[in-house]
């Protein structure tokens, strides 16, 4: 199997770049990948490649063997047909010649058989004819033996054809099983690709979650920084307020001191009524100082009012920060809950993926065992095929030997046939000459018997054997006979030499699409698959119908105090009012300091 995966699934699946380009006949070859990079081929891929090459070589060897057996069978049958035709022609020719000889012998006059030389020649002819008949019987026996051998060769050819058909059926079943294995591998590859896509999606979601965690941490860090800044700012404002309160306390203590002084002045006003006139000059300065102090007090009151407004703004700003902090805490808690839920769902998915990966490993081990069993079965088939090929080779060797023996015997038969045909031609010529001589002698004897009027008595005993006469003079060449009947068709000639290869023809047009094949057999029912992972949450449902109106709720709590408005711009100074009436005389001031001594007076004349 071409099986591999990336990362932790290194030894799970090995996949090729060309898929599948040709997965209909051969098993796919996939390059192993390790962590997204192409790695070396695994041992299983090499075994699969060697198995494919061996199966292809076995297919080629089977086709060549079938072609060779068919060619040899055709050659053997052609030679046997030619031999049978030659033998049938020879038998027909011999039969015709024997029939013609018998007719000629029957046409002879029985009275002419008195001649001893003719009797001897007839006996010799009979002996030769018997020899020819014996040779023909031997030929018939040889033909019967050859027919038996031909029957044996036909039986062996039938055995070879049946075995080749069995081998082709076994190879077809092997190819069908390999095709089924390839289909199962394709389905398994599709499942593994889906698992890889899911793992990639999980990686992307984990990256998104980590990025969200980093963003939340950065937001919390920024919030902490802003809270620290606001705390420092509040601390500075508190310092300023402490300083202002200290100044106010100082002013209050001064005011109390002044009131005490004024009380002492009131108590001492009765006592110092005498010196009020002396210190009226200092009252103007003191009144001016009092007016200045009142103005400074008014300014201090204005500053205190501004500080109070600033404190109100700061308090509203702190309230806003508290609300923002509450919102951030709520969002962080919500994000934490969401992250916890996502991590729990991811843990569930990881557990389901671990279960699926375990099932994948079990399926891979099962397929590995199945492939090993298939390899063992293919090895057994290869051994049986090699044994069958060896037996077929031995049978073909013996067939070649028998064919060579048959060819030798056919050559001997042809030579004997040529010799017998020559001897028959010679004997037929001699017989024709003897028959002509016998006809001439018969005519001569007839004429003599007609001329003789003396009645012969009983024939006496035969006389002694005379001397052998001299060979007669060769008679004249006879006239040319009529044209004979057309003979039977001769045997087909030998196959001529193979011609030179012709030029390649033009590329033909693409033929029409073939008819759709028959539907394949229904596969066996698969085992129960493992439970699928938990599905994603469905889309949000439609808005339901409005429910009945509920009872009026209880009044809610009062809302927080609103933010103070922005302080307006200081208005332009108003017009100076009219001078008011003269006020009541103020409190008598304290006695002034004693003045410097005056100049010496003039001495009166008195």
From Swiss-Prot:
The keyword DNA-binding does not apply. Keywords: Collagen, Endoplasmic reticulum, Glycoprotein, Golgi apparatus, Membrane, Repeat, Signal-anchor, Transmembrane, Transmembrane helix. Residues 456-558, 559-601 form the Collagen-like domain. It comes from the Eukaryota. Glycans are attached at residues 115, 182, 224, 257, 313, 337, 365, 400, 430, 451. It is a single-pass type II membrane protein. Residues 455-606 are annotated as: Disordered. Residues 497-516 have a biased composition (Low complexity). Residues 78-606 are extracellular. InterPro entries: Collagen, Oxidative_Scav/Glycosyltrans. GO terms for cellular component: collagen trimer; endoplasmic reticulum membrane; Golgi membrane. The chain crosses the membrane at residues 57-77. Residues 1-56 are cytoplasmic. It is found in: Endoplasmic reticulum membrane; Golgi apparatus membrane. Residues 526-535 have a biased composition (Gly residues). Residues 548-558, 591-606 have a biased composition (Pro residues). Seems to protect cells by scavenging oxidative molecules or harmful products of oxidation. This is Scavenger receptor class A member 3. It comes from Mus musculus (Mouse).
């Amino acid at each position: 199997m071409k099986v591999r995966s990336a990362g932790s699934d290194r030894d799970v699946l090995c996949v090729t770049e060309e898929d599948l380009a040709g997965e209909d006949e051969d098993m796919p070859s996939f390059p192993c990948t390790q962590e997204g990079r192409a790695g070396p081929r695994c041992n299983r891929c090499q075994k699969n490649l060697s198995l494919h090459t061996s199966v292809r070589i076995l297919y080629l060897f089977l086709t060549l063997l079938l072609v060779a057996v068919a060619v040899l069978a055709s050659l053997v049958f052609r030679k046997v047909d030619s031999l049978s035709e030659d033998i049938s022609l020879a038998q027909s020719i011999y039969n015709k010649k024997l029939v013609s000889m018998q007719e000629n012998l029957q046409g002879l006059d029985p009275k002419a058989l008195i001649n001893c030389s003719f009797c001897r020649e007839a006996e010799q002819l009979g002996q030769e004819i018997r020899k020819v008949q014996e040779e023909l019987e031997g030929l018939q026996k040889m033909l019967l033996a050859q027919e038996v051998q031909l029957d044996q060769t036909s039986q062996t050819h039938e055995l070879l054809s049946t075995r080749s058909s069995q081998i082709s059926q076994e190879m077809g079943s092997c190819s069908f099983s390999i095709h089924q294995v390839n289909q199962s591998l394709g389905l398994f590859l599709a499942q593994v690709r889906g698992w890889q896509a899911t793992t990639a999606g999980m990686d992307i979601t984990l990256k998104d979650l980590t990025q969200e965690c980093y963003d939340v941490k950065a937001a919390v860090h920024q919030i902490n920084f802003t809270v620290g800044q606001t705390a420092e700012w509040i601390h500075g404002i508190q310092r300023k307020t402490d300083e202002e309160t200290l100044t106010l306390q100082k002013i209050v203590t001064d005011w109390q001191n002044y009131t005490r002084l004024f009380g002492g002045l009131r108590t001492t006003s009765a006592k110092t009524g005498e010196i009020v006139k002396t210190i009226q000059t200092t009252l103007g300065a003191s009144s001016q100082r009092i007016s200045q102090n009142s103005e400074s007090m008014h300014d201090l009151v204005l500053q205190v009012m501004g500080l109070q407004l600033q404190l109100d703004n700061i308090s509203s700003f702190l309230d806003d920060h508290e609300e923002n902090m509450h919102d951030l805490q709520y969002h962080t808690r919500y994000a934490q809950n969401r992250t916890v839920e996502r991590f729990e769902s991811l843990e569930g998915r990881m557990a389901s993926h671990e279960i699926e990966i375990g099932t994948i490993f079990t399926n891979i081990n099962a397929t590995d065992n199945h492939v090993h069993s298939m390899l063992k079965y293919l090895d057994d088939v290869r051994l049986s095929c090699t044994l069958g090929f060896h037996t077929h080779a031995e049978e073909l060797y013996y067939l070649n030997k028998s064919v060579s023996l048959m060819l030798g015997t056919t050559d001997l038969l042809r030579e004997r046939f040529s010799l017998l045909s020559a001897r028959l031609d010679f004997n037929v010529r001699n017989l024709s000459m003897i028959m002509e001589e016998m006809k001439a002698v018969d005519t001569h004897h007839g004429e003599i018997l007609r001329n003789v009027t003396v009645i012969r008595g009983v024939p006496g005993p035969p006389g002694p054997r005379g001397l052998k006469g001299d060979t007669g003079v060769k008679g004249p060449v006879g006239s040319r006979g009529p044209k004979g009947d057309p003979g039977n068709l001769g045997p087909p000639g030998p196959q001529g030499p193979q011609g030179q290869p012709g030029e390649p023809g033009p590329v033909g047009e693409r033929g029409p699409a073939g008819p759709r094949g028959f539907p394949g057999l229904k596969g066996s029912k698969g085992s129960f698959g493992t439970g699928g992972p938990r599905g994603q949450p469905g889309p949000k449902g439609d808005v339901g119908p409005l429910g009945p109106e509920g009872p009026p709720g209880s009044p809610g709590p009062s809302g927080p105090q609103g933010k103070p408005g922005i302080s307006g711009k200081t208005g332009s100074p108003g017009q100076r009012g009219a001078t008011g009436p003269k006020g009541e005389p103020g409190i008598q001031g304290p006695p002034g300091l004693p003045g410097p001594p005056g100049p010496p007076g003039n001495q009166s004349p008195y």
